[in-house]
Amino acid sequence: MKLGIVAFTLISFAAQALALVARENLPKPQNDPFYQPPDGWESKKVGTILRSRKVNINTLVKDNLKEAWQLLYRTTYRSDDEPTTTVTTIMVPHNAQNDSLVLYADFEDAGAPQCAPSYTWRAGLLSDTSSIFNVGIAMLYLQEGYIVTMPDKEGNKGAFGSGHVEGRQSLDGIRATLAFDKIGLNKNARVVGHGYSGGGIQCGWTAALKKSYAPEINSVGWFTGGTPSNVTALVEKINGGPFAGYVAGGLGGVISTYPDVKAYTDKVFTKQAQKDLEFPRKHCQEEITLHFLFKNFYDKSFSTVGKRFLYEPVVQKALNELTMGTNPDFTPDTPVLMAHGVSDEVAPYEAAHETYKSWCKNGADVEFVSFANPVSAHGVTTVTSTVPGFLWNRDRLQGKPVQGGCREIKNYDVGVNSHALGEDFESALGLLKGLLGDKIGPNDEYLKDALHK
């Protein structure tokens, strides 16, 4: 869910004009033996490392790195009796601090195996040009000396948007990283997470599930921005618009992880719908966005019951489970910084604010930053929220306390100062600033115009 419309056009241009990519001829995950677990893996504890390997990161961050590793580890889907495996990619900078770990929630926003960070970060940026955003953000943490771990949080089912899956697989990725003895990381290291948009789903659910699923992890803070915290509200907002492709990806992720939803949709979705839902399982985010431009998923050509499929009790039961804040048992026990643009045209602002209020009601410590300038659309806020999120997480890793309870703040920034963190960080901030472009229009109107043309 990460692309506001300005960024969508600029990002492809930047990748080509700056010649950031040198692709390698890598086997895709489904053809790479590393991803296949050894015999007996099902009996291992969650977080157990099954394989490890050194890898080359083929993006701008390679200049920041001492080394990079990948771990195949045991994890689960929605419940403990659904064992599976996935991979996390660990990046270790030259000046690594061994008492801190950053979970970076890459916003892959697609279900195909080749869209996962374990592949795209090795294959090069042009395998998914929107990865430039991810690189710019991760560079900040690496430059500060933090080890970064990036789990493939959707597993083998392409569970995009299925929050309990993403949260569990992220927490097990943290467990595996902390247990890995070749990077010098303290086993009780402080842990923070950073995620925006689709990464906000991952990071938000990691925060929400940590207390019940992985209480031993020493988490100290989570940043989640532009978060689609309510799937029903998300579908209602983007269906039929330029970002309708996220509906296809999200439906596919929910159907693949909720068998009762699959049984229902198999009855009411048309053959064309079944074909449509295969596309996000084989392609990455940019292709999905373009393929489903202005697609109306309520049309009878997709659903024989029209819009009613979304509100069928079996579907609503699943979507309610996937709405952050509805279950008090899944309330973060570690401080959270939420950020959201008031003009977000992808992830509904009101839904994220409801999550904030619910978490606060249930005792969480949450700071909610509203990017209140009218031009603070989804893509713009991806960039403008990055430095505040980084600084807030850095304070947590440095042991600085937060103000307890909940509070709301308004931020009117619409730009990035590439000198804001000093010259050591100018390359990362300059990259993000370049993605924002010289012009900003209300609700990212520039790409909307381009798409209509």
Curated annotation (Swiss-Prot):
Keywords: Cell wall, Disulfide bond, Glycoprotein, Hydrolase, Lipid degradation, Lipid metabolism, Secreted, Signal, Virulence. GO terms for cellular component: extracellular region. PANTHER family: LIPASE 5, PTHR34853. It comes from Malassezia globosa (strain ATCC MYA-4612 / CBS 7966) (Dandruff-associated fungus). Its EC number is 3.1.1.-, 3.1.1.3. Secreted lipase involved in Dandruff and seborrheic dermatitis (D/SD) probably via lipase-mediated breakdown of sebaceous lipids and release of irritating free fatty acids. Has triacylglycerol lipase activity and is able to hydrolyze triolein, tristearin, trilinolein, tripalmitoylglycerol and trihexadecenoin. Hydrolyzes diacylglycerols such as distearin, dilinolein, dipalmitoylglycerol and dipalmitolein. Mostly converts monoolein to di- and triolein, while free fatty acids are only produced in low amounts. The active site is at 197 (nucleophile), 344, 378. GO terms for biological process: lipid catabolic process. InterPro entries: AB_hydrolase_fold (IPR029058), Lipase_secreted (IPR005152). The keyword Signal applies. Disulfide bonds join 115-284, 360-406. This is Secreted triacylglycerol lipase LIP3. Glycans are attached at residues 98, 230. It catalyses: a triacylglycerol + H2O = a diacylglycerol + a fatty acid + H(+); a monoacylglycerol + H2O = glycerol + a fatty acid + H(+); a diacylglycerol + H2O = a monoacylglycerol + a fatty acid + H(+). It is found in: Secreted; Secreted, Cell wall. Pfam families: LIP. The gene is LIP3. Residues 1-19 form the signal peptide. Belongs to the AB hydrolase superfamily. Lipase family. Class Lip subfamily. GO terms for molecular function: triacylglycerol lipase activity.
